[in-house]
Amino acid sequence: MKTTTRQTGRYGAFTPVPLPGRTWPNNIIGSAPRWLSTDLRDGNQSLATPMSPDRKLAMFELLVSMGYKEIEVGFPVASQDDFDFLRVLIEQERIPEDVRISVLVQARDELIRRTVESLEGAPRATIHLYNATSPLFRRVVFGMSRNECKDLAVQGTRLMMKYAEKTLGDCDLGFQYSPELFSDTELDFSLEVCEAVMDVWQPEPGRGIILNFPTTVERSLPNVFADQIEWLSRNLSRREHVCLSIHPHNDRGTAVASAELALLAGAERIEGCLFGNGERAGNVCLVTLGLNMFTHGVDPGIDFSDINEIRRTVERCNGLAVHPRHPYGGDLVYTSFSGSHQDAIKKGFDALEREAAHRGAAVGDLPWEMPYLPLDPEDVGRTYEAVVRINSQSGKGGVAYVMSAWHGLNLPRDLQIDFAHVVQSQADAEGGEITPDRVKRLFEREYLSSSDLPVPLASGTELVTTSLHIDGERFDVGADRADTVQAVRATLTRWGFDVRAVHRTGIAGQDRGPDADVAVYAECRVEGRVSWGVGIDRDIEAASLAAVRSAVIRARLKRLPARGGEATGIVAPLVAAGR
């Protein structure tokens, strides 16, 4: 059987670019490039079932709403559907005044003529002309010499200008040329062809040209592509009239890196697709590129504030699901299952809230510094609810976060540890994820259902009574409301428990009214062993009694000694509604 190792001799390393004094490694990305979305052309042509007219229109409207100003709307001579869609956009005046459409065409006479006709009546448009220039395609696909290949590009440019002059006189017409398979083409030949094309177009102020350099098939390391782009930027004539554009593909999985390094090297425009759709492994992902800039403090000029709606529309139009791990947009990219990650995230949120309170500011106005989360999910329309999800790998931090964020219960640290063991045991037994609602039910079963009876309090405002059931015996306690916990302490002391109640009352939860619930956490220590109980009630005394009794009874149910211990009640406010 052949092995992959034995086949490596069939492949060779990509030849590096000799570039003394390269400057791009010392540069930074300080502003956004020009963006072009090719979802409706390169993305659409890669689909097993191309978009219907309705889906194309939905994609176009999404791109416009996000702020893309250059949109490649199709390949009009490739299909009647593409031609008809372009006509709908023009004839129904669906192209906003600040948006420029683009169409692709090969450097062939009849194709160029038909493409120009498809644009009749368009207010603004760019014709994107291309021909393959790599040695492999010249030799194997077209049987052309270098001069013949260059002449094809030159003649295509002349034909485009001739037909456009006759048909598109009122159109604000732009011109783009791409040496297809640029990254596989000799650099000197790419430059030669581009210079010949510019000699025909004659770029000047107000009449620039887009020279677009695609990694039609990604073969090299990103730094090699950056060297190619810097070499071109150095050597192109009329550079001030050239918009140096790139079109990275993702065959090696490094399209984003290639694009970012190319920006450092002088690229000024990027073509790509939302969520990386496109031929084979896809085009560069415009979402990833834009939000990478956003997280470095650079405004991408694109609205990603509702990433879920963007994703839903793209999935519906493409008929392809976005991977749950796709950067910024996948279902799981803001989620942690690991216990150590969850603990760090919880501490990060706690620190942000403390800092916000200290400054008297909203959390959303503070610099984002959060373990494991490079982007605030709320900045792209996500919530914090899915940041922490619970399974057998989760620890106290994750459990505590879910109880606080979902259910408004801020558990004392030792109770976090105690309950985490309960949740982890359940996750091990069941397998899979434990939902927040399931976590709450486990909490209620474990800590709120340990008493035989609810804690009864007399209806009077001064005198209260309650009952304790310990080891099968009932003990009634009556006292002034202010002395209820002390009375319980005295009763339990007679049975060998030293009860100490510590009330911690802080800021009320979301419900700050007089009827807001409070949560009381009681820690019962019996001969050095610990049992926890919880009480939740609008009446703080009722909650305290329920918590202490729950803790004592849980100790008994665990077969702990019934005497010779102590119980401690800790009272804290409920942080969020939801009993």
Swiss-Prot record:
Q: Carries keyword Amino-acid biosynthesis?
A: yes
Where do the annotations place Mg(2+) binding? D42, H247, H249, N283
Segments for region (Regulatory domain)? 450-579
**InterPro entries, per this entry?**
2-isopropylmalate_synth_dimer (IPR013709), AIPM/Hcit_synth_CS (IPR002034), Aldolase_TIM (IPR013785), IPM_Synthase (IPR005668), LeuA-like_post-cat (IPR054692), LeuA_allosteric_dom_sf (IPR036230), LeuA_N_DRE-TIM (IPR039371), PYR_CT (IPR000891)
PROSITE patterns with a match to the protein in the record: AIPM_HOMOCIT_SYNTH_1 (PS00815), AIPM_HOMOCIT_SYNTH_2 (PS00816), PYR_CT (PS50991)
GO molecular-function annotation terms? 2-isopropylmalate synthase activity; acetyl-CoA C-acetyltransferase activity; magnesium ion binding
| Keyword Amino-acid biosynthesis set for record | yes
Q: Which cofactor does it need?
A: Mg(2+)
Query: In the Enzyme Commission scheme, what number(s) does this protein have?
Result: 2.3.3.13
Instruction: Name the pathway.
Output: Amino-acid biosynthesis; L-leucine biosynthesis; L-leucine from 3-methyl-2-oxobutanoate: step 1/4
Q: Where in the cell is it found?
A: Cytoplasm
**SMART domains according to UniProt:** LeuA_dimer
Supply the Pfam families for this chain: HMGL-like, IPMS_D2
Q: Give me the disulphide-bonded residues.
A: none
Keywords, A to Z, come to: Amino-acid biosynthesis, Branched-chain amino acid biosynthesis, Cytoplasm, Leucine biosynthesis, Magnesium, Metal-binding, Transferase
Alphabetical GO CC annotations of the entry are: cytoplasm
Recorded catalytic activity of this chain's protein? 3-methyl-2-oxobutanoate + acetyl-CoA + H2O = (2S)-2-isopropylmalate + CoA + H(+)
Q: Where is the Pyruvate carboxyltransferase domain?
A: 33-308
Q: What EC class does the entry list?
A: transferase
Q: Which GO terms describe its biological process?
A: L-leucine biosynthetic process
Describe the subunit structure.
Answer: Homodimer.
Homology family: Belongs to the alpha-IPM synthase/homocitrate synthase family. LeuA type 2 subfamily.
Q: Which NCBIfam families match?
A: leuA_yeast, PRK03739.1
What function is annotated for this protein?
Catalyzes the condensation of the acetyl group of acetyl-CoA with 3-methyl-2-oxobutanoate (2-ketoisovalerate) to form 3-carboxy-3-hydroxy-4-methylpentanoate (2-isopropylmalate).
Q: What is this protein called?
A: 2-isopropylmalate synthase
Give the species: Streptosporangium roseum (strain ATCC 12428 / DSM 43021 / JCM 3005 / KCTC 9067 / NCIMB 10171 / NRRL 2505 / NI 9100)
